[in-house]
Amino acid sequence: MIDLSFLTEEEQDAILKVLQRDAALKRAEEERVRHLPEKIKDDQQLKNMSGQWFYEAKAKRHRDKIHGADIIRASMRRKKLPAAAEQNKDTAMRAKESWVNNVNKDAVLPPEIAVVEEPEDDTDPAGPSSSLVDPASSVIDMSQESTRTPAVSLPKQRKNPFNSPKLPEDHSLQQTKPEQSKTGKAGLFQISKEGELSESKEKSSIPDMPRQQLEKPKQTVSTEPENASHTKAPIPKARKLIYKSNDLEKDDNQSFPRQRRDSLNARGAPRGILKRNSSSSSTDSETLRLNYNLDPKSKILSPGLTIHERISEKEFSLEDDSSTSSLEPLKHVRFSAVKNELPQSPRPVLGQEVGEFTVLESDQLQNGTEDAGDIEEFQNHPELSHKTPLSHYQLVSSPSDSGREREQLMSSGSAPRDEIPCHSDILPTGPQCVESSSVINGQQEKSSHFTKLPSELSKSPSDELTQCGEPEPSQTADHSFRDHRQGSEEEHSPVLKTLERRAARKLPSKSLEDIPSDSSNQAKVDNLPEELVRSAEDDQKADQEPDTNECIPGISTVPSLPDNQFSHPDKLKRMSKSVPAFLQDESDDRETDTASESSYQLRRYKKSPSSLTNLSSSSGMTSLSSASGSVMSVYSGDFGNLEVKGSVQFALDYVESLKELHVFVAQCKDLAAADVKKQRSDPYVKTYLLPDKGKMGKKKTLVVKKTLNPVYNEILRYKIERQFLKTQKLNLSVWHRDTFKRNSFLGEVELDLETWDWDSKQNKQLKWYPLKRKTAPVALETENRGEMKLALQYVPEPSPGKKLPTTGEVHIWVKECLDLPLLRGSHLNSFVKCTILPDTSRKSRQKTRAVGKTTNPVFNHTMVYDGFRPEDLMEACVELTVWDHYKLTNQFLGGLRIGFGTGKSYGTEVDWMDSTSEEVALWEKMVNSPNTWVEATLPLRMLLIAKLSK
């Protein structure tokens, strides 16, 4: 609020003229925008010319800002409040400050029109002396004064005649009756008295009021024909989807249609005193700057225009049930099982700005001038405070509805879903219900200072918030009503907080290779189920446990053992099934290769000039038995050591009206068990539109915990034109979510959309598809990946003076690479990694330094591996891979596998023994020429399971 008390009359008139010109310009602009769809057919051009883009950007950047004109209007109206009335406010007065005092007005105008067409008057309608005059005449004078002001321009502060200190309550009531007969304005006085009596029936002022006195004014109101225009309650129009913003300007003094007015006059009296909570966003209490989502074809506003309303919890009438029928058509109920984010008040919602009365109301809240009449009404009628559960639906109603109508419609929440129109962007439910009722709860908290609520009322806000929870998963048949909830719904999930704390915690000096990255985007996309929330504490405990598999920093040469380190076929077979890390794109957007190769930046391997050796194959072989899925290499043609089995049930449909591809994922059955001991997995489904995975993005379902037969019933949506689908393939894969390690592949299904019949009803039905193993990409194998210039040497006896029998060493001299491919435009920062298969332990890996800004990097780096006997050379394979390092991710460029290429290692079939003829020739030459450097330039190739670059 702004203090405008210093303004003179001339200055106020000048400001009002500016506001009037602003309102006229707004009306002209709205008229122009309303006719735009008739001339412009292009959606993007219509969005630009209508100014929709501006309001969207403004809502994002200035969410907490209020329109300047509204602040000025509210400040000028605030100035009109009588100073004496503010000083004499007490608890009983606050119970009567309500919209009910304005029900005898004959017009309902928006605030900006009221300011423009009705000049303000500085005279105080109820001065300090009003409390000393006769109560009846003072009320009549105030009613006459209020008819000369705009209908809802300001909730005037009136002196309650029943609280006059010089007149007893019952005496004042006896005096008012003869005054009615003397004046010709009994209707006005009776309306005012009826509003005050039926609103609260206060115990402090009229404790023993007979019920006949409450009913008598209702009968006399209908007998005054000359005041018929004053007896109509200002019922605002019920909002519909088809809404024109200039209706209010066209109907300046008509607050509702003539048919509605006639029906009210036919009954003789308005339907009781329609109590309106000031927190309800009705058409007469705020300026709506509508977001025009216009459909050029239908020329109507799209469902995105739906106005979010804050629901008043306490709009109840004291009339009988027979009076509810005339207002039944005015009720518009919309249900939605979808969550959208609702900005907290007073933030604008998609172009809707906070009106001037919202500013006034917030100012009254701060000054403690809150209406307490609603709560006292609950005290006198505790049966009205009963709330029927929402039954998984959220209710939206016009602010003029009675409480009994609301109870009837809320109790009908269990109606069949096929009779309820569902919109995906109407009203939020779930946690956002707390925000939508923030004004109501604040009102109850402030009013509790004056009045102690009964148990029913104190219990109702929490009960209603509890009922606002998200709906239960629907059955398979009604999947069209389900919407895939993505975004930041689970921002308050304890698991997400746990992961954020772990990600923010300072890491020790150990390598990033040893730490599986757990802070993933999946937790921000998946709506975590109850099981994952319940297991949050377990995750925290497990996170606090020390990592027993942590590798010891530093490099040392371990003497080799004379046993046959490679003679364990069962271990070898298990290692050949490990997950290829750099292809494992299921690491929750951790686009890394073998367990995040960015650890080379930490210089974990402190190599000294005197010792180029790393841990030998002997030490590597001892760790074979403890190898897990997180120890990965490039060699594996499989995507995990889990058996692929089971099937998935889903259906495809293309919605022309939305231009969206819908993938309805129903359920899976008989999946592989990631937890073999407990025979369970934590599966979820992920989809891609190939070949361009990055453009359309991946979509995921929720993670269903601890089951092999998950039920999802979710719709994954892709915004894509139908003609583009002919060039796409749908890849649907099932994965096991592991909290602390990489996710495991459970199977996939791939459908070619080029030949898909979208008009066939059979294709829209749910079908079971068997899960298959992941296929290796062969399209990139023939690409030119560059070349590597290197030299190999086998040293059979590096230290002949020792007593124990020694083993040989293999020296690998990586000289340079030529013509490496550019995957990031003109940027390249390459390095080489070496592993001797079948040893895949982290301790046995060695890397070169990274050389940037060139496609022909010179490394000149020698790697030494010991522990080799002559027979081991027949079973081993040197794997050299080239990577492009960028920040925390590495992209695979190409690689070599130098060995004999027999397809077997120690009698076990392995997929990494696939050397080309050139690679085999180099390895044979090295074995046959010990203690001699054998040099060659070999072409890099895309290994069998290498990841497609994005």
From Swiss-Prot:
In the record, the effect of K700Q is given as: Loss of membrane localization
> Per the database record, which ranges form the C2 domain?
644-769, 784-913
GO CC annotations, alphabetized: melanosome; melanosome membrane; membrane; plasma membrane
* Effect of inactivating the gene: Mice show a reduced number of mucus granules, a deficiency of granule docking with the apical plasma membrane in the gastric-surface mucus cells and reduction of mucus secretion by gastric primary cells.
Pfam assignment, any one: C2
Which organism is the protein's source?
A: Mus musculus (Mouse)
Native organism taxonomy: Eukaryota, Metazoa, Chordata, Craniata, Vertebrata
The Gene Ontology biological process terms listed for this entry are: exocytosis; intracellular protein transport; positive regulation of mucus secretion; protein localization to plasma membrane
Q: In which tissues is it expressed?
A: Highly expressed in brain, lung, kidney, testis and in embryos after day 7. Detected at lower levels in skeletal muscle. Expressed in pancreatic alpha cells. Isoform 6 is highly expressed in brain, but not detectable in the other tissues tested. Isoform 1 is expressed abundantly in the stomach and is predominantly localized at the apical region of gastric-surface mucus cells. Isoform 11 is expressed in cytotoxic T-lymphocytes (CTL).
Write out the function statement from the record. Isoform 11 acts as a RAB27A effector protein and plays a role in cytotoxic granule exocytosis in lymphocytes. Required for cytotoxic granule docking at the immunologic synapse. Isoform 1 may play a role in melanosome transport and vesicle trafficking. It controls melanosome distribution in the cell periphery and regulates melanocyte morphology. Isoform 1 acts as a positive mediator of mucus secretion by the surface mucus cells of the stomach.
Free-text note regarding domains: The RabBD domain mediates interaction with RAB27A. The C2 1 domain mediates localization to the cell membrane.
Q: How is it modified after translation?
A: Isoform 1 is highly susceptible to proteolytic degradation and is stabilized by the interaction with RAB27A.
Per the record's keyword annotation, is Protein biosynthesis included, yes or no? no
- Keyword Ribonucleoprotein attributed: no
Gene Ontology molecular function: any one: phosphatase binding
Protein name as annotated? Synaptotagmin-like protein 2
Q: Where is the composition biased (Low complexity)?
A: 608-620
Q: Which residues form the RabBD domain?
A: 1-57
Membrane-crossing segments per the record: none
Where is the stretch described as Disordered? 78-98, 116-289, 361-620
Variant or mutagenesis effect after changing K698Q: Loss of membrane localization
State the CDD domains in the record: C2A_SLP-1_2, C2B_SLP_1-2-3-4
Q: Which InterPro entries match?
A: C2_dom, C2_domain_sf, FYVE_2, Rab_BD, SYTL1-5_C2B
Q: How does it assemble?
A: Monomer. Binds NRXN1. Binds RAB27A that has been activated by GTP-binding. Interacts with RAB27B.
The UniProt regions of compositional bias labelled Basic and acidic residues, in chain numbering, are: 87-97, 193-205, 246-264, 479-502, 531-544
Give the UniProt keywords, A-Z: Cell membrane, Exocytosis, Membrane, Repeat
